[in-house]
Amino acid sequence: MKVIKRSGTTQEYDGKKITSAMQKAFDSVGQTCRQEVLRDLLSQVEQNLGEGPHTVEAIQDMVERILMANGYYDVAKSYILYRQKRTELRSARMELADAVKEEGFGKILLEIQRDFPEEEYGLHLLYNKFSGFRKSDLTIHEILNALIKAAVELTTSEAPKWEYIAARFLNYQFGLELAQELKKRGIGSFYDKLRYLTDKELYGAYVLERYSRQEIEQAEAFLDPQRDKLFTYAGLDLLLKRYVIRSHHGAPLETPQEMYLGIALHLAMEEKENRMDWVKRFYDMLSRMEVTMATPTLSNARKPYHQLSSCFIDTVPDDLTGIYRSIDNFAQVSKFGGGMGLYFGKVRATGSSIRGFDGAAGGVIRWIKLVNDTAVAVDQLGMRQGAVAVYLDAWHKDLPEFLQLRTNNGDDRMKAHDVFPAVCYPDLFWKLAEEDLNHEWHLLCPHDVLTVKGYALEDFYGEEWERRYLDCVRDPRIPKRTVTVKDIVRLVLKSAVETGTPFAFNRDTVNRANPNGHRGIIYCSNLCTEIAQNMAPIESVSTEIRTGEGDTVVVTTTRPGELVVCNLASLVLGNIPVEDDSYLHELVGTVVRALDNVIDLNFYPLPYAKITNRRYRSIGLGVSGYHHMLARRGISWESEEHLAFVDKVFERINHAAIEASTELSREKGCYDFFEGSDWQTGAYFKKRGYDTPEWKELADKVAAQGMRNAYLLAVAPTSSTSILAGTTAGLDPIMKRFFLEEKKGSMLPRVAPELSIKTYWYYKNAHLIDQRWSVRACGVRQRHIDQAQSVNLYITNDYTMRQVLELYLLAWRSGVKTIYYVRSRSLEVEECESCAS
């Protein structure tokens, strides 16, 4: 039998569609209907219809009559209402398709009806909203803008999926624009596109130099446009504006899926075996939104200037040449979109001597002001100003002024509003704060200590640091600036509440857990407080004049020190089946390999960073979608269940990452300083209480095979890449379940991921959460993270200074290494783009 569709086309009759519609009608009135009854009703319909062909309406009319003839009046009524509703939806769909009049748009609307069948996503609602924005003589682009705006405005906490519908319209609009640009340039295949982009210096020539045409065509077959449906409107809007390749005049030249494939091609470029398999695995993990790479990797992979690293950390030495070199290093890093951490703990304090002249030194503040001006001046091609965190030790003589760098009162000549201050705390400071805030606290100049004692106090930690610090305090030859612990705490908390900073770095906790303590010390962290790796200042060796072949040159020789660089990626926990151990291990293994490849493929803005990165081969695998993961499993943030669950999850992630790194070491070789490390001795595993047979087996494997990477895990804030993946940022709880954000004249819906009746109450707002649970959870996770975590504290106006201090003390007692922002409810803070993995 043939069926005549409303469009006039015919198709084969399918009785299953009729039984499905009748079943829904029975369900809608709360009646159960056995399959044999449905089959009998269908048989009656078919007998009464005869051979056909029949229109859809004629078949539906017959279904109504048969239902009533068999006494199912309520069911028939429901079926009639169902038909009426379908007619309304069809009418709305036809009106919308007629408004756009572009090929393929009707299919988009049909898919939306199929994928979002709930009443609150009816196209008649969209049409009614769209009609209010519609005007005569609109272009296709303007009509689609109106449709997108309508879908965005329909997005609410009760109907959150409209943000996915808005994304589909945006993607369709982008596709039309892209198709025009490709046609104009005569681009057909993916290979043609790469050839064109390479010729225009928008793609790195290295891609086509490494891959054959056949391999590019094989890669093109990996593309899955259906994965565009995973984007929310906010995520797709961000990706199209910031990440896809555009011409020098802003014309789009790459689809979202081609962007992910281009990144995968770059990251797998140097694989010796099964290279195309790795291309597919890298593409799949990115396009399925199970993993996000850091913002510089997403932006710059596949391009001529492929600076893929997020953050850099430099130790500022105590000499004029070294200070200006560090500032220049920051400028070079900022130029290519990286963020910086600068450790100023070695720089002499205000009033210290220079070449024996007492009182000549101007202190760290004037140098930090130069860093501040550099951040403003080197603004990444006018896109955004540079970002830098400046770290100072809690015993440094300039600390009181340092803690007022960003506050609103005081001498403006001593301010630096565009840097992010951070303080490095020894255990002794917190011990005294816990015991009695009136304890004396002695501030010292590092140059005075070095001159009198012959050692740098900051080069030690733990009990040895405390012994030497107290010895310096007792030594009358060393000038001191004596305050109380309360004085420092008051300045810290005042600045934290006003500005969100200083960040906190618990140096003894960090260095005790350092798996590479045999090679040095960790002075500070990076811009986003998640990196903790060995550091050493760059040293000038000599400057000489050389003449040869009629030319004179000045040659400066330096020792590279250890300038830290971090390559980041994040597991999107909300999109991963974290309970599936084999799936998690395979995914972690894939992303660890990708990050390890970044080290060799990277364009380094500084030669010092290249040397450190290739010696240590450090990576920073983190997570995003943490609150998303908890909510979709019905786990309350403020619960012991939360702590127990994440303890297991992060232990499995750590196990998988270590296993991946040791297997890479077996395949490609271990990092330079493995011998003598905690990895090699087994101390890493003992310190963390990893004593199960499974862990002992892994420890033995590591000792035998080595580790490819000196450092593995670091949890970045992921402020922008979490938007791309449609998940919650980093380890943070959500700010609100739903809100509309205005950006450059347009409204962006922000909805908690998978918001529904089931998840609603598990999405508690960050400022309403008891922060002690957040700190305790951070302590639980920290055992499994060899570096650190970007963790924010959320406070309200009801918090007393004592309560905020208690959170810092709890963090220290819980083994938390760093604290990022203190987010007061009324405070707006600037996010780091570079670490947004």
What kind of feature is each model-predicted range?
Residues 251-321, 468-495, 499-504, 649-700:
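Gly/Pro-rich turn-and-neighbor structural signature
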Residues 172-226, 309-560, 564-570, 577-578, ...:
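Active-site cavity-forming subdomains of large catalytic enzyme subunits
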Residues 141, 146, 177-182, 230-232, ...:
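Long, structured ligand/cofactor-binding scaffold of large enzymes
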